[in-house]
């Protein structure tokens, strides 16, 4: 990928992370790409964790990629989400060099964006992705510090029909998710689901876990419901640990 393309992809990702944290198009108006990236750098902390809920340093990935010929300076220039993408793309080769299968070698490293506008964590943001009707969909979901309440959601990349894509991008659709809960009363992960039609009519008793459906998008909604819960489940061990930390009144800005 050419430098200009790389920069644009980076900017798009950062803008979507800012968007799910609550920054509007009006907030971004007049800001240069450098200003937007600087805002991201100042307001977010990027945390890497493995499948065992253990923090991972980006230097660990950098060292492994250097064994494949990547230059230290080249890797240092990458944002953490870019580094993780390269690392995951090279897992098969890294595993082969280590004499292991991908399943044995893969640490299951994933990213959490900690939104800290005033120094303490306000939102936890994670990437979400999975199959819609016509192909992969990508987005982000933001959770408040109770790691239960949805603060925002954005779908930014997909190949669904143009009309559906426009509907998914509308602030009015995203606002439907705000305040919804991913846990039931017993603390079990149930996620948030897109209903068929009016959520109030079909799921009045579980309205905290449902949003209104989109006309003509039943199969897309089914895909969203499946991959959103699966992605939240992947992060649930980490979220559970953080909830316990919050309950013991440890400062929210303190990250293990």
For each of these PLM feature ranges, what is it?
Residues 1-256:
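Flexible, solvent-exposed loop/hinge segments and secondary-structure transition points
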């Amino acid at each position: 990928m050419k430098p200009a393309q790389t920069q644009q992809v980076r900017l798009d990702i950062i803008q979507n992370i800012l968007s799910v944290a609550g920054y509007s198009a009006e907030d971004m108006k007049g800001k240069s790409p450098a200003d937007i990236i600087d805002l991201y750098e100042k307001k977010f902390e990027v945390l890497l964790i493995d499948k065992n809920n253990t923090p991972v340093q980006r230097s660990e990935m950098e060292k492994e990629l250097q064994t494949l010929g990547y230059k230290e300076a080249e890797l240092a220039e990458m944002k953490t989400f870019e580094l993780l993408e390269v690392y995951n793309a090279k897992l098969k080769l890294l595993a082969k060099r280590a004499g292991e299968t991908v399943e044995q070698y893969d640490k299951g490293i994933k990213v959490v964006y900690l939104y800290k506008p005033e120094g303490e964590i306000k939102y936890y943001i994670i990437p979400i992705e999975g199959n819609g009707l016509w192909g992969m969909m990508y987005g982000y979901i933001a959770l408040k510090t109770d790691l239960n309440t949805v603060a925002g959601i954005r779908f930014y990349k997909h190949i669904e029909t143009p009309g559906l894509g426009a509907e998914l991008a509308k602030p009015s659709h995203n606002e439907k998710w705000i305040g919804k809960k991913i846990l039931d009363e017993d603390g079990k992960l149930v996620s948030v689901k897109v209903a068929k039609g009016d959520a109030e009519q079909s799921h009045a008793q579980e309205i905290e876990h449902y949003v209104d459906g989109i006309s003509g998008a039943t199969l897309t909604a089914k895909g969203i419901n499946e991959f959103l819960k699966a992605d939240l489940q992947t992060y649930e061990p980490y979220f559970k640990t953080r909830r316990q930390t919050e309950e013991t009144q440890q400062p929210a800005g303190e990250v293990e």
